[in-house]
Regions:
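Conserved GNAT-fold acetyl-CoA-binding loop/helix
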Residues: 28-49
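Juxtamembrane/interface motifs at transmembrane-helix termini
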Residues: 39-43, 51-53, 92-93, 180-181
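Short loop/turn motifs at secondary-structure junctions and domain boundaries
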Residues: 51-56, 142
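Surface-exposed alpha-helical segments enriched in charged/polar residues
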Residues: 49-50, 111
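Acyl-donor (CoA/ACP) binding surface of acyl/acetyltransferases
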Residues: 1-27, 60, 64-184
Length: 184
C-alpha cells in the first residue's frame, strides 16, 4: 500500500472487484482521452481470480481518497525495453479532475517503481490535447520527448501521442533537492 496525504494507491481487494468493474466499464465517465473499449465483467473477474491484476508484464492499483472511496486506477506495464515501464491512469469521476489525485498517485507509483525495482526509465503517453495529463507529467518531473505521429486508435480515430519520460537520475536528483530543503 502506498499512502500519500491526498490518496492511497493499493492493490485491489476481493471486496473491490464488483465496484471496480462497474466504475471501469462506465463508458460516459471515460471522457475524450481514455479508450472506449471495455472488457466483459466475467473476463475481469477471471483475471482478478487468476492474477489479482498483477503479473510480470503489468500491475494494476486502485486509487482511493481519504474516505476510502475508489476514485481511480493506475497501472504500469512493459514498454519497449526491459529497463522501461509505461504508466497509465484514470479517474472514475470526471468531476474529481484537477484536484491533484492523479498527480499524487503518479508520484507514489514513481517512488515505488524506482525504489523497489531496477527500472531506469518511466514513460507517459497521451493524446496531444490532454492538458490534464500533460500537467501531471510536468508536475511529476517528466520531460517531453516528442510526438509519435498517428500512434494509436482512440474513440474512433487515429491519433498522435505525446511521449514524456522520467529517468532514474532525474528522479533521484529531484528527491535530493526536496529532502535537503531547510525546515520552516
Amino acid at each position: 500500500m502506498l499512502r500519500g496525504r491526498l490518496c492511497t494507491v493499493r492493490h485491489m481487494l476481493n471486496t473491490d472487484v464488483n465496484a471496480y468493474i462497474a466504475l471501469t466499464n462506465d463508458l460516459p465517465s471515460r471522457g475524450d482521452y481514455y479508450s472506449s473499449q471495455f472488457t466483459s465483467p466475467e473476463l475481469l473477474r477471471k483475471e482478478f481470480i487468476q492474477t489479482a491484476f498483477v503479473s510480470e508484464d503489468k500491475e494494476l492499483f486502485v486509487i482511493e481518497d481519504a474516505a476510502h472511496n475508489l476514485i481511480g486506477s493506475i497501472h504500469h506495464f512493459k514498454s519497449r525495453t526491459p529497463l522501461c515501464r509505461e504508466i497509465g491512469y484514470r479517474l472514475f469521476d470526471p468531476a474529481l479532475a484537477g484536484r491533484g489525485y492523479i498527480t499524487a498517485a503518479t508520484g507514489l507509483l514513481i517512488d515505488y517503481l524506482f525504489g523497489a525495482y531496477q527500472y531506469h526509465r518511466l514513460e507517459l503517453m497521451m493524446e496531444p490535447n490532454n492538458v490534464g495529463s500533460e500537467r501531471v507529467a510536468l508536475k511529476c518531473g517528466f520531460t517531453f520527448e516528442g510526438t509519435l505521429r498517428q500512434a494509436f486508435f482512440l474513440n474512433g480515430a487515429i491519433r498522435d501521442a505525446r511521449l514524456y519520460s522520467l529517468l532514474r537520475p532525474e528522479w533521484a536528483a529531484a528527491r535530493a533537492v526536496v529532502t535537503n530543503l531547510p525546515e520552516l
